[in-house]
Amino acid sequence: MASPTQGQVITCKAAVAYEPNKPLVIEDVQVAPPQAGEVRVKILFTALCHTDHYTWSGKDPEGLFPCILGHEAAGIVESVGEGVTDVQPGDHVIPCYQAECKECKFCKSGKTNLCGKVRSATGVGVMMNDMKSRFSVNGKPIYHFMGTSTFSQYTVVHDVSVAKINPQAPLDKVCLLGCGVPTGLGAVWNTAKVESGSVVAVFGLGTVGLAVAEGAKAAGASRVIGIDIDNKKFDVAKNFGVTEFVNPKEHDKPIQQVLVDLTDGGVDYSFECIGNVSIMRAALECSDKGWGTSVIVGVAASGQEISTRPFQLVTGRVWKGTAFGGFKSRTQVPWLVDKYMKKEIKVDEYITHNMNLADINDAFHLLHEGGCLRCVLAMQI
């Protein structure tokens, strides 16, 4: 059924980031109709992620202002552009910052979940068709963010960047399956491929780290060691599968040596979920020689570099990275939603706060202060 607003410009509320580190401004934003290969989505719920905060802080070299941030959300298709066949108005969807065109060399390789089709546009805050934005305020364009821009009541995304999901799934919960939870689960299941009986170390017990722990427990890990400098996180972490807790501040030795001593030579798998290059090195060096695998999940600040002694790799350790946990977005996000509906993965447990779009600056403050895992915003003002 056609939407009454199909083909028209929609004026709606959005949280606009005009400058780094300045409060977001709730504005009346004009959202243009979708062009060929595009989908306009009514966003109902969006969560805040540290990646949004990172770009807002001004530390992201690809950060463009003014922009509409947000990339972890769920909504309903309002209208589609010419040639779009995989979704239609009324479909429940999750926008996906990691596209999946199924046609480019990356998608066809079977070796990665990366996709090359629209990256040249999403990386510079525009849409592929005309390299322009679909957002404006009083005639002035506002940049897109990560190809999603979910801090707006309506957004326009590429059709290769939207996953159709079970309409019975609660959108205020499954919006989390757009980023953090799949990133952690997939780092374990797809990137590291943790086996039953493994010893696992998780550095950083935020949402992504807890999802790593959950994934490790589901994979049958015998020990899941959580590493964080906040002791209060351990009680929460136990609910996600962490069996032991280590606070680096409570030890004189380097944390990698502490873990080597605790595990008879090192862990089988380690995951860095912070974005700190010195911790990335520690995560590698706490893994066992011969087969230890360390996965970089956290995103370091621009310009930072990782280092270790080559001997660490010569003796059999493997250093890997992961984006969106290796999940193919359009194919596997619906599968993750179905797993949630069958109670096979946690989602609700990551949500510590619920607020409205009007409260977005307070929500950012909560995230920055470490006072929440995930805050879900309803899009009303």
Swiss-Prot record:
Binding site for NAD(+): 50, 204-209, 228, 233, 274, 297-299, 322-324, 374
GO molecular-function term, one example from the UniProt record: alcohol dehydrogenase (NAD+) activity
Protein origin, superkingdom: Eukaryota
Expressing tissues: Expressed at low levels in the leaves.
Cofactor dependency: Zn(2+)
Broad class of where this protein is predominantly found: cytoplasm
Keywords: Cytoplasm, Metal-binding, NAD, Oxidoreductase, Zinc
Binding site residues for an alcohol: 51, 71
Protein EC: 1.1.1.1, 1.1.1.-, 1.1.1.284
Binding site for Zn(2+) 1: 49, 71-72, 179
Binding sites annotated in the UniProt record for Zn(2+) 2: 101, 104, 107, 115
Name the record gives this protein: Alcohol dehydrogenase class-3
Organism name: Zea mays (Maize)
